[in-house]
Amino acid sequence: MPEVRGDSRNMVDLSESPRRASHVTTYRKHDPDTCGHCQRNRSAPTDLHDRPGWVQDAVFYQIFPDRFAKSDRVRKPINLEPWDAPPTFHGYKGGDLLGVAEHLDWLSELGITAIYFNPVFRSASNHRYHTHDYYRIDPILGTDEDFDELLAACHERGIRVVLDGVFNHSSRGFFRFHDVLENGEQSPYVGWFHINGFPLNPYAMDEPANYEAWWGLRALPKFNTDNAEARDYLMGVGEYWAGRGIDGWRLDVPEEIQTEGFWEEFRERTRAVNPDLYIVGEIWSEASGFVNDGTRFDGTMNYPFTTATIAFTVGDRLDPSTMMDNPHYDVAPAVDGSGYRDRIEWLLDHYPEPATLANLNLLDSHDTARILSIASGDEDSVVLALALLLTFPGAPSIYYGTEVGLDGGLDPDCRRSFPWDHERHWNQRILHATKDLVALRHQHPALRSTNYRILWPPDDGDGSMMFAVERADDDDRLLVVVNAGREREIQAITREQFAFEEATLVWGDGTLTAGDNQTSISLGPRSAAIWVVE
């Protein structure tokens, strides 16, 4: 009988009696011959409802522009915070677009093929969600020409560029809102916003604002998207940057725009400019109503995957100070293998395969604490979560700095500067795991397919902390196993459910043994392994 062993420390006595799997969950393989969504390097979609084919093959990297890198070629204001000082809510560090361009080799070495940028337009905030001008690059980030240079450099390396679109609200400094502040009822733009009376009070907190704002924050006046002029303006912004050459839009709080047909029109108009444009919505909860029929978004930021994966890999190591006051960010309580299986099954059942392939999967972001801090500094949790992220269907997204073990609590601490000058403090284990897993994803089409067959745990998992899944695509077949528990686990799956003739351990440590009637999997505590099987 063939036996494949990893680290010799994983040798165990197979005379033990592991539980046998009686339940296997299978998600039907997507057929590239009948559905073009899965074809690599395919041409642009011919139907408005098609998802861009490049997304399922992409590995994203999220950049918060003020904190990633800064170039000496961009003139800066004097009053900047020190790069390595703790971030504050309102302070600027001075990161810029040419700084990103000068570090593209780093991203290429990681295997990154797409960048999602937090907002880059003129704004009065370091995060730039307070938009002043949707048609100009923020001067601290550089010039419009700097953006063109960055875009060209990314495309030369095969890296796609996705921008953050904030279309639900603008800012107090947005020209048309400022005109309303100056001219009141006589402003030609009074209908662009939800005005409840005059005078407007954008700063006097002891007076009613007299206008609607996002979450009541006066700095963020909400657009009246029922107004034809305002709506056409926002559509034009989407078209303009699509015409400038971007590859996608990440849409901020899109579910808060209630105007009927708004996002359908946005998709139609922007995809008319670039038929291969990726449109992904920031929706924290289950988002099938926004993505399933392909009339609005290609996919969603997949926070249900985030929270399930953290609950499984981090478990009771979770730092309570990193918890968010968000009912959809349910990283606690901890779950075992069965709990993780249930949440992943629920997630995959809620989306058709094209949407699953276009979802943006992540572990952390500018809106959450960083995963290393969530896990109270436990690097095992990060490595296990990366293994699940980079073998899951859809596009994985790595938040800048996660690959070197950058930590940080809730906003603003999760927006620390990238520690370029402190390489000695980088977490080399996390960095190597990130590089190796990204490379493995690029090498194996199976890891980018929708064929996701859960082999373990069964329905009666009885507290098992192991999770095993088969990933397959034509002749490419892999077994991915994670043991999130504190003890070694040995589990058996019947040969009828999972059989192989040869297996090669390509990442991690573990032992895989094929018997006459069963396949035995053995993993040490807090470990993961990936095999290529035939």
What are these regions (language model features)?
Residues 59-61, 115-117, 161-163, 249, ...:
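Hydrophobic faces of well-ordered beta-strands that scaffold small-molecule active sites
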Residues 234-257, 361:
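Active-site groove signature of glycoside hydrolases
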Residues 151-160, 168-169, 174-185, 236, ...:
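Active-site-proximal helices and loops of the catalytic beta/alpha 8
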Residues 1-64, 68-70, 75-114, 148, ...:
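Carbohydrate-interacting/catalytic domains
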Residues 49-60, 64-113, 120-244, 266-272, ...:
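Substrate-binding/active-site clefts of carbohydrate-active enzymes
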Residues 354-376:
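Active-site clefts of carbohydrate-active enzymes
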Residues 63, 107, 117, 134, ...:
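Conserved, mostly hydrophobic/aromatic
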Residues 64-67, 121, 138-141, 167, ...:
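Short, flexible loop/turn elements at secondary-structure junctions
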